[in-house]
Amino acid sequence: MKSRTCFAVVVLLLCPLAGFAQRRPHGKRFKPESIHVFPANLVTVRSDSPLYQVQIMVRTGSADDPAGKEGTAYLVARALIEGGFGLPRKPVTTQALAEITRPWGDAAFPTVLVDKQATTFSVTVPRSAFAEYVRRVLKPMFTQPLWLPKEMDRLRRDTLTDIQSGLRFEDEESLGLLALDNYVFSGTPLAHLARGTVQGLQAITSPDLNGFYKKYYTLGNMNVATTINDQQDLSKLIDALPAGEPLYRPANLRASVVAPGRHVLIITQPNAIATGLHLGYPISLRRSDSDYWPLFVANVFLGLHRDSFGRLYQEIREARGYNYGDYSYIEYAYGRPDFLFPPPTTPRDQQYFSIWARPVGHEYAHFILKAMTAELDRFARQGMTPEEVADAKVKARALYLNYAESVSRQLGYRLDDLFYGMRDQGYLEQMLSRIDAVTAAQVNEAIKKYLQAQNLDYVVVTSEAEGEKLATDIAGDTNVHSKTPAEYHISSPIPPDKQQILDQDKQWAAYPLNIPRANIRVVKAAAMFETAAEP
């Protein structure tokens, strides 16, 4: 007889949410939600919607890919939905699944997001149709995968095309962001794309997929978040998932060590019209750590994602107009450059600090590389004033409504909470009170502890015509070009505020990167993501 987890219900109120609702911006409607927390791997968010939302996070991802078969986690997840499931004599293919789910809306067709340590499936279905949905879709999808050869060939081919054509040559910004995501973790299970590698994808067989599925896809290895509160429907949901216990994990992915010195990977595309710049290094910080919220506030001040508030944006974009934006991060942010607010469900045991400078003109690349490094160095050494911390806290509080704006996002954060061991006091639940409690001393202590500019990994994406030249310039500290006063539209006599910009430019230009040529590699985009090893 299959063992199933028993659920006792505990009700928690999102008190910070209710308090914030009284101070919400004009015109913004936001309803406090109550959350039922089960003493297991299932949480529910109460909703009055006639639709059920279900998110299922499997505690596995590309970090568990077998060596030489990188992409296994990704193909397994995609194949559960698109590789055929159910009875072999009448398989539910992608086309059949679309027909089955069409009466229930587009969101009833399952979607999946695969990251390094988590794979998350999402569906939305009418309450009235849930029993039929479980019977026809959810249960056979998770318990009767068929790995149809034709569908597997299609999924493999599509994924290879995404990497070989799309990512390498058509998406300059994603190329740089994902290359850095790998580069800072060189030599670890995190050092390849969640989608896999070219050679790894080509080597994967159907038995590989089935073995991975049987090992990791068990109820005990899943976290579930849903708007279902009816006990019978909850039982149907749990019964639809494969039985099994949690997987023992001896590996410690928080053990990454920052390599001494500065290292640069320059990736060249045939016809890149601008140069993208990135830097980063691993940090041992999780959302459950006491330093998280002080560093969160600090990062809001330094480089809040897709916002003009941050210092990096103000200095490089607003005051000087070099690019479309400059941002910093204390954890991986999925979906850049597209998402305004990075979505949840990509939790990791090992995170990294990074700065992303959106593409600049080739002639300014060396200068902006110095500028972003110098600004990080200054921030790490000087920290923040009490006034700056106070301003950053106000901005950080304002993010709350965006992070919690939908039930879907709330479910995702609850899954992350389970991953990080924060079930009893979740990320959104504690966000406002923890930000309010942050002091300037705590912020500066966190900056001192986690931020530095001496040991950095850089990823630069530029054109093939610029790659070797830029490597020589960086190593030799030559050809550092900023804009001229005329390009800044500064008239003579120079106003005092504009003189400050020119003076700061001189300091940035003189900032020593001290990167020897031996620490700089130039590789063509066509060589990226071929194997798990560095190109």
Which residues does each PLM region occupy?
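Scaffold signal of the M16-like zinc-metallopeptidase fold and its non-catalytic homologs
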Residues: 166-218, 238, 320, 327, ...
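Hydrophobic h-region of N-terminal signal peptides that target proteins for export
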Residues: 11-20
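M16/MPP (pitrilysin/insulinase) zinc-metallopeptidase core fold and M16-derived inactive scaffolds
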Residues: 25-27, 55-124, 132, 191-195, ...
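Non-catalytic, conformational "gating/processing" segments within enzyme and secreted inhibitor domains
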Residues: 151, 161, 165-168, 177, ...
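An aromatic/glycine/proline-enriched structural segment found at the starts
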Residues: 23-27, 186, 218-219, 223-285, ...
